[in-house]
């Protein structure tokens, strides 16, 4: 059964989220840039993943600002704005402390959230974290090598 969608206010923007499961531990399942609440329930492997997490506690999943059922925005949100959105959702859900579970592109914002609010983070699970952005020196070096080939 697909859980009801709730909305938390982060400034002037409504952030859509769902709660799955219950238990003593809250888990914020933060998807990367792509993915939304609606498509989550259309992907059997992802549903199994969420249901597995829900056996451990209450899972909070959100649509990032400008995606899915959350309000549209004109600009790409910064890590700090996205962090504030996570805080708005956890506050609205009554979560004082949670494990943050995420991967790839969302690991930066999860790490920033944990560093900013250590008292609110019980744990940090980072799957396939990205240590470099697209403008990293490594990418510059690769571009240079490719440009030198004749």
Question: Which residue ranges define each predicted feature?
Answer:
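Short, hydrophobic/aromatic-rich segments at coil-to-beta transitions
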Residues: 1-6
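Conserved HGGG/HGGXW glycine-rich cap/lid loop of the alpha/beta-hydrolase fold
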Residues: 7-71
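Short beta-strand immediately N-terminal to the catalytic nucleophile in serine-hydrolase-like folds
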Residues: 82, 100-103, 127
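Conserved acidic catalytic loop of the alpha/beta-hydrolase fold
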Residues: 80-98
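Short aromatic-enriched loop/helix-cap "lid" or pocket-rim segments at secondary-structure transitions
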Residues: 40-42, 73, 135-140
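Gly/Ala-rich beta-loop-alpha elbow adjacent to hydrolase catalytic centers
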Residues: 102-110
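Structural signature of beta-strand start/N-cap positions in the alpha/beta core
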Residues: 58, 97-99, 121-123
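Flexible "cap/lid" loop of the alpha/beta hydrolase fold
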Residues: 111, 115-116, 120-150
């Amino acid at each position: 059964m697909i859980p009801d969608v709730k909305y938390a206010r982060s400034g002037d923007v409504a952030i859509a989220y769902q709660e799955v499961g219950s238990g003593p531990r809250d888990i914020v399942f933060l998807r990367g840039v792509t993915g939304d609440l609606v498509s989550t329930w259309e992907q059997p492997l992802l549903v199994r993943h969420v249901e597995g997490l829900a056996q451990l506690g209450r899972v909070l999943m959100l649509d990032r600002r400008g995606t899915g059922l959350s309000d549209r925005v004109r600009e790409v949100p910064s890590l700090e704005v996205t962090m504030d959105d996570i805080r708005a959702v956890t506050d609205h859900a009554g979560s004082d402390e949670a494990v943050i579970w995420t991967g790839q592109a969302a690991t930066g914002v999860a790490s920033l959230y944990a560093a900013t609010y250590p008292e609110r983070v019980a744990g940090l699970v980072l799957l396939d974290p990205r240590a470099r952005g697209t403008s990293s020196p490594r990418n510059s070096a690769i571009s240079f090598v490719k440009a030198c080939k004749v």
